[in-house]
């Protein structure tokens, strides 16, 4: 797990309001607010682009971005512009139909990419993230996107909560038509998770070793289905065979129906 992190502000963005918010973030994460970032191996740096998790050089305090959530540019921006159609596999997996958009609980929000795609397609999505740092980065990315007049309409479909998904579902799971899971799976050589961004996420949140318990809870409360994203060729969670699978190049969706509409 990542540790020994500070929150650092770029001087030119500092205002009274930003300083108040920065103190609230530091308190929530239980990390120091410091202008001596070179004393830490990692830092949440707040600059004109927003919040990003960075590695810090002990030699000169320079930084390299590790994680940054951007719903308007990069991969998410590309998907919004090019891939957001109901023909894509995730739309079929969660139960999107002509004239019908399911309510979706994303139990493993991560970088928020899949939840964002579903929001683009008109689904009401609740993103749940238990890692405080991932939650903070997500919150910052969502807030920045909401400042754009076009993106604000899409982001209105997204709700973000910081919680343990299993515990939340035990109390509120019946509110959702579809429960979506994309658990971190054990590391394998040559896995797509060897990409730097995903390695950092793994270090930050660890493997989802409780995914079997989460699936069990989800199956008892989902209104229509539970969708589990898995690497292609990976075993089913707890060897529980789904009702059907949607296979892609490197991954698949295991679809477990809890009722038939």
From Swiss-Prot:
Disulfide bonds: none annotated. CDD domains: AdoMet_MTases. S-adenosyl-L-methionine binds at residues 129-130, 182. It is an enzyme of class 2 (transferase). GO terms for molecular function: rRNA (guanine-N2-)-methyltransferase activity. Pfam families: SAM_MT. It catalyses: guanosine(1516) in 16S rRNA + S-adenosyl-L-methionine = N(2)-methylguanosine(1516) in 16S rRNA + S-adenosyl-L-homocysteine + H(+). Belongs to the methyltransferase superfamily. RsmJ family. This is Ribosomal RNA small subunit methyltransferase J. It comes from Desulfotalea psychrophila (strain LSv54 / DSM 12343).
């Amino acid at each position: 797990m990542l540790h020994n992190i500070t929150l650092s502000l770029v001087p030119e963005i500092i205002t009274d309001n930003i300083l108040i918010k920065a103190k609230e973030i530091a308190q929530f994460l239980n990390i120091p607010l410091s202008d001596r970032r070179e004393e830490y191996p990692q830092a949440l740096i707040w600059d004109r682009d927003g919040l990003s998790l960075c590695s810090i050089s002990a030699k000169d305090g320079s930084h390299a971005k590790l994680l940054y959530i951007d719903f308007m540019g990069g991969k998410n921006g590309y998907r919004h512009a090019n891939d957001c159609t109901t023909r894509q596999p995730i739309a079929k997996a969660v139960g999107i139909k002509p004239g019908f958009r399911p309510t979706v609980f994303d139990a493993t929000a991560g970088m928020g990419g899949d939840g964002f795609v579903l929001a683009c397609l008109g689904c009401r999505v609740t993103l749940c993230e238990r890692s405080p740092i991932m939650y903070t980065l997500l919150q910052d990315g969502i807030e920045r996107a909401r400042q754009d007049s076009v993106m604000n309409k899409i982001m209105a479909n997204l709700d973000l909560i910081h919680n343990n998904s299993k515990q939340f579902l035990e109390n509120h799971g019946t509110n959702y038509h579809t429960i979506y899971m994309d658990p971190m799976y054990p590391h394998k050589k040559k896995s797509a998770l060897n990409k730097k961004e995903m390695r950092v996420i793994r270090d930050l949140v660890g493997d989802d070793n409780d995914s079997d318990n989460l699936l069990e809870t989800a199956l008892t409360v989902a209104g229509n289905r539970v969708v589990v994203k898995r690497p292609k060729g990976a075993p089913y969670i707890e060897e529980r065979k789904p009702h059907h699978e949607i296979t892609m190049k490197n991954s698949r969706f295991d679809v477990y129906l809890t009722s038939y509409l």
